[in-house]
Amino acid sequence: MRYADPSANRDLLGSRTLLFIFICAFALVTLLQQILYGRNYIKRYFEFYEGPFEYNSTRCLELRHEILEVKVLSMVKQSELFDRWKSLQMCKWAMNISEANQFKSTLSRCCNAPAFLFTTQKNTPLGTKLKYEVDTSGIYHINQEIFRMFPKDMPYYRSQFKKCAVVGNGGILKNSRCGREINSADFVFRCNLPPISEKYTMDVGVKTDVVTVNPSIITERFHKLEKWRRPFYRVLQVYENASVLLPAFYNTRNTDVSIRVKYVLDDFESPQAVYYFHPQYLVNVSRYWLSLGVRAKRISTGLILVTAALELCEEVHLFGFWAFPMNPSGLYITHHYYDNVKPRPGFHAMPSEIFNFLHLHSRGILRVHTGTCSCC
């Protein structure tokens, strides 16, 4: 008869005990890291229900620092950035006047929207050989006919409007109920003929003071206005008396179709003004944001409008700007509030743009709205 060695059983039991202790210790350390590393989750859970914190409270200073300490987007996981941003929403937002003025002063030196946002008779005299933004070898000679289309001077001046809303087209706007807050702004910018029909007004509002039109939309949807003139005119009437803004001098392909927009509105005796981005303004804005890490073939129209708004408005609010497939709560959203058509890959650097907006929000320079609004 063979007998089991009792010491062997004790060794096996001891090994299992050590393994169990190791697993428990590892789990405990991991749990403590989750609780203590970077943020105190339990404390924040209860703080959330205490109501919004004042902008300059110690807690909010810490939360803003957690956004600002991320110098480049690749430093943190997307979920980590979302969590930090979501935590910051418990803080009231207020404009940091000194930070905002300093930033606007920088924009004034590099870009100067009040003087160069649009081509005007003042900044682009008759006979000017205007260089395109992209086709730098291309030159457009400003003749009498084109010169008459330009306003005599910029229609807007520095800090003219108290509160502006720049409305992007992101799916983050869907079910936001931000329409009333957008409509309450003194001046509203919109991008690329977005739908503002009754189906969407609760979320996106209707007020529009400037709406941009990408010439590719005119080419694809309205056959370059060679035949489809009235349908295009009807689309613009949705925005009532909003000014129409186009990048006529971005490249040579854009010019004729952009100028045709002016002819169409004149033919239908529309009161809507037509303006064209000054190509040098677009070049300067692109260079400025490149210096802040936005590397793209072309910056988005939204970023251009935000840059201009920061000079033309005292206070700037952003709606519909979000470049991720999930909202800050981790729920999947459509790319636009009206469809899920993705952009051409590699053309814009939208995540980098949004990342910069979150920094500007944290510095009190502008406000980014990504949640549900409770206006007025």
Curated annotation (Swiss-Prot):
Keywords assigned by UniProt, alphabetized: Disulfide bond, Glycoprotein, Glycosyltransferase, Golgi apparatus, Lipid metabolism, Membrane, Signal-anchor, Transferase, Transmembrane, Transmembrane helix
Lumenal topology ranges: 39-376
Residues noted as binding substrate in the record, renumbered to the chain: 192, 214-216, 300-302
Residue positions the entry lists as glycosylated: 56, 96, 241, 284
Pfam families: Glyco_transf_29 (PF00777)
Class of enzymatic activity (EC top level): transferase
Superkingdom classification of source: Eukaryota
UniProt GO MF annotations: alpha-N-acetylneuraminate alpha-2,8-sialyltransferase activity; sialyltransferase activity
Main function: Involved in the synthesis of gangliosides GD1c, GT1a, GQ1b, GP1c and GT3 from GD1a, GT1b, GM1b and GD3 respectively.
Name of the protein described by the UniProt record: Alpha-2,8-sialyltransferase 8E
Classification lineage: Eukaryota, Metazoa, Chordata, Craniata, Vertebrata
